[in-house]
Regions:
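Long terminal segments
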Residues: 2-5, 13-37, 41-46, 52-54, ...
Length: 137
């Protein structure tokens, strides 16, 4: 019940003001909301989530961005910082742990590669529904 009340209090405060700061027991801002901007910090003061209009960043414990969304661009990184998924409008790439592209979708073209980088499937001019079916395993 206490959590629900705190959440309701936070929502009420956000609706009634443009700027909101939620602090931890040491007085450090943990959640910061200002207009369309939202920032949350971890116990070391590093920003974990960052939302600013169309931009969203989710960081790991080392401060590296794992998820990055900016408009139509989406990047998802692995623990080494290499982009695993990349989406930009019509282009989608998925990479393996060595950075090799496994799936590549660009407009109406689709390539699927094996672990050695050899092209297994190549479609050109296929319907979008086929692309979705092939990408989901």
């Amino acid at each position: 019940m206490k959590i629900n009340y705190l959440f309701f209090l936070l929502i009420t405060t956000i609706m009634s003001a443009q700027s909101v700061k939620l602090k931890d027991r040491y007085g450090n801002a943990v959640v910061y909301v200002d207009g369309l901007s939202l920032k949350t910090k971890d116990q070391y003061g590093k920003s974990m989530y960052y939302i600013d209009g169309q931009t969203i960043k989710l960081k790991d414990r080392y401060g590296e961005a794992l998820y990055f969304i900016d408009g139509n661009t989406i990047r998802i990184k692995d623990k080494y910082g290499a982009a695993v998924y990349y989406f930009d409008g019509q282009t989608i790439r998925q990479k393996d742990k060595y950075g090799q592209a496994l799936y590549f979708v660009d407009g109406q073209n689709l390539r699927v590669k094996d672990k050695y980088g050899a092209s297994l499937y190549y479609f050109e001019g296929i319907p979008e529904k086929w692309v979705i079916v092939c990408l989901i395993r």
